[in-house]
């Protein structure tokens, strides 16, 4: 039996859900003995056992006081080396990934890069680029969640093509969630410059008869735009931290999820929308076109055309209940086939087995 360690030190619920779901699926398998290493206080549910290692590590990839807790770091590395893993898979960037990779012994290491080209305006852009360069140097394999940026990764970081692997996003998937038909539209996620909140403001003003729920913590650079959003009568704004249950309620209690981004690698929000049977409308930026079955699971709009986006949203909101229910069910089925952890486990194991043969 081969042994694999799944690692995320992120406090991001998406990264946790991704890895925890894979851990649970692989626990059902006889061929792989799976372990999980994550932060001490995860935000999402986890089936804990003697194979789940929860540590009080720094929760962000940047440098903090906890980064230099060397006794804890070395104890983690010692524990890893003692288990003689065949593979170690890192779902998110983190400063501790690097020493673990360097001292992993014979284990094959896999690192996911979510942002090949860090988003302009993001406060962490320099750190992300630096971390990308470092993990490309030390990891055996680099994993991308989309096909669009494979060549960009190869060119930007001077990495050989045989070290780059594509693996679709995945999430734990619930049962189908019936439509509520309440005429609400959801914009969800941390409000950063690249998320297109400037676009959202114009779209909101072009659609005065549509009700918008805008939920997400606000980047300091976006306070002014969000302040203007808050004044719009058709906007309900929530900038507080939301729990898993509150997130679920947000998606369930809307008809459409909108993604008016200025740039994107891929969107976890689209995966979450499908998870709760909600179709999407998005700008065709980055790798987002890989995620939308056009006119079936949702709609794509030419990047930056807010007027066209507003027109498409009005059109979507005007469909009758039967037509919407058909779109909603298709979005769920499309997303489940493409993104459910239960289906992704075979692709993930194949990645590990192919890497082991090299």
Where are these regions (language model features)?
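A conserved mid-protein helix/loop that constitutes part of the nucleotide-sugar donor-binding site
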Residues: 16-21, 192-206, 271
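Active-site proximal beta-strand in glycosyltransferases
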Residues: 87, 102-120
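Short His-centered aromatic/hydrophobic patch
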Residues: 90-96, 113
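Nucleotide-activated donor-binding/catalytic signature segment of Leloir-type glycosyltransferases, i.e.
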Residues: 224-248
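Conserved acidic donor-binding segment of nucleotide-sugar-dependent glycosyltransferases
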Residues: 294-295, 299-307, 315-321
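A short, well-ordered alpha-helix in the C-terminal region of glycosyltransferases
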Residues: 322-338
């Amino acid at each position: 039996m081969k042994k694999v360690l799944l690692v995320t030190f992120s406090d991001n619920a998406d990264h946790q859900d991704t890895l925890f779901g894979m851990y649970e699926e692989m626990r059902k398998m006889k061929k792989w003995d799976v372990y999980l290493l994550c932060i001490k206080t995860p935000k999402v549910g986890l089936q804990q056992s003697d194979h789940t290692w929860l540590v009080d590590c720094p929760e962000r990839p940047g440098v903090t006081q906890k980064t230099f807790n060397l006794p804890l770091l070395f104890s983690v590395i010692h524990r890893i080396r003692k288990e003689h893993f065949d593979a170690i898979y890192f779902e998110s960037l983190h400063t501790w990934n690097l020493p673990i990779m360097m001292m992993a012994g014979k284990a094959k290491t896999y690192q996911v890069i979510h942002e090949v080209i860090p988003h302009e305006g993001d406060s962490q852009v320099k750190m992300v680029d630096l971390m990308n360069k470092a993990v490309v140097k030390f990891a055996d394999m680099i994993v991308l969640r989309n096909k669009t940026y494979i060549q960009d990764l190869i060119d930007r970081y001077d990495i050989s093509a045989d070290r780059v692997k594509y693996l679709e996003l995945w999430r734990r998937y619930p049962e189908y969630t019936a439509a509520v038909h309440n005429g609400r539209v959801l914009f969800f996620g941390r409000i950063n410059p690249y998320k297109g909140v400037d676009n959202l403001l114009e779209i909101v003003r072009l659609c005065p008869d549509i009700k918008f729920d805008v939920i997400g913590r606000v980047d300091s650079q976006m306070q002014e735009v969000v302040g203007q959003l808050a004044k719009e009568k058709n906007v309900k704004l929530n900038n507080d931290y939301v729990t898993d249950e509150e997130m679920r309620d947000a998606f369930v209690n809307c008809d459409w999820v909108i993604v008016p981004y200025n740039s994107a690698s891929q969107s976890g929000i689209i995966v979450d929308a499908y998870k709760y049977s909600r179709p999407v409308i998005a700008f065709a930026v980055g790798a987002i076109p890989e995620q939308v079955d056009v006119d079936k699971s949702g709609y794509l709009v030419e990047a930056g055309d807010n007027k066209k986006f507003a027109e498409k949203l009005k059109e979507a909101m005007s469909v009758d209940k039967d037509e919407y229910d058909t779109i909603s069910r298709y979005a769920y089925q499309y997303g489940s086939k493409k993104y459910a952890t239960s289906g992704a486990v075979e692709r993930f194991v194949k990645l590990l087995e192919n890497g082991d043969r090299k």
